[in-house]
Structures are given as structure tokens and as C-alpha cells.
Amino acid sequence: MIQHIVMWKFREGTEAQAEEFLTRLAALDGQIECIRSRAVRRSAVPGSAYDAVLVSEFDTLEDVARYKNDPRHVAVSSLCKEIRTDRRAIDVTI
């Protein structure tokens, strides 16, 4: 099992766009078959190093690659490129 973890820091003044991005990202659950579970969360502490996190679980690294290249994921991801100042990701075996 693979856990795919992504964190974002958003530009100031982009709160509405960030909320739209996170809402659409969460909506991918159930739409892309290879996603086993996922959680999209905002930081509980204002001013944290990162503003939001995605934690998804997949059976294999191949499933992670399929997810990353799925047109629905690509479309949602494109919403984030202009509003983020930083993004970090890691895939770990669980």
C-alpha cells in the first residue's frame, strides 16, 4: 500500500481560489477508481509552514502514476499552479 502525501502553501489573497481547489480535489474521491482512501485538510494553525495537506492511499506506485496522469486530476491540479507558493510531495510505503 502506498500513501501519497502532498502539502501546499498558498499565496496571500487567494483564499477563495484555494478553497475551490481543495473542494474539487476532495471531490475526486470516488471518481478515480485507483484511490483507496483520501483526506484533504486545512492546517489547524494559521501561519503554519503549509496551508493544506492531501493524504491519499493507493495499492501500488503504478496506481499513483495512473492517478497523477488521470485527466480529472490534471484538470484540478492546474487550478493550484497560480495560487501556490510551495508544494511538497512524498510517496511512502505503509
Language-model regions, residue ranges each:
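Sterically constrained small-residue positions within well-ordered secondary structures
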Residues: V45-G47, C80-I83
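Short S/T/G/P-rich N-terminal loop/turn motif that feeds into the first structured element of a domain
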Residues: M1-A52, D59-N69, V92-I94
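A common structural junction motif
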Residues: D29-I32, V74-S77, R84
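Charge-dense polyanion-binding interfaces
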Residues: K81-I94
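Short, flexible helix/strand-to-coil boundary loops that buttress conserved ligand/catalytic motifs
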Residues: K68, S77-C80
